[in-house]
Amino acid sequence: MLSPKRTRFRKQHRGRMKGVSYRGNHICFGRYALQALEPAWITSRQIEAGRRAMARYARRGGKIWVRIFPDKPVTLRPAETRMGSGKGSPEYWVSVVKPDRILYEMGGVSETVARAAMELAARKMPIRTKFVIEE
């Protein structure tokens, strides 16, 4: 599971996801990519599940790049706890993804293999995505 080694602060505000992604929306490393079409928080477990599904399908061929990193802590209160007494403790990490953000890249495989592998990864994501080919 991906998570930061250390952070400046343990807890963060939730924030809001406005607009589209202006950074990380171009293919940089591979030839094929999976691009987000909706805003969402994507957990480190979901990122890892998508990566594993792609790697398992592509086997030894090709290389996979994960272009998002979960750097936002999400806090949860214990079950059946009364309100008050501060914010809950950090439970898991998420990546804030806006529309047009590249999630995964792939290279060194044919388009059919890449498309099928990305489709498997897309099924693990909580958002709609699209398959992109580098021009």
Curated annotation (Swiss-Prot):
Assembly mode: Part of the 50S ribosomal subunit.
Main location: plastid
Encoding gene, per UniProt annotation: rpl16
GO cellular component terms attached to this protein's record: chloroplast; mitochondrial large ribosomal subunit
Domain of life: Eukaryota
Keyword terms: Chloroplast, Plastid, Ribonucleoprotein, Ribosomal protein
Protein name in the entry: Large ribosomal subunit protein uL16c
Pfam families membership: Ribosomal_L16
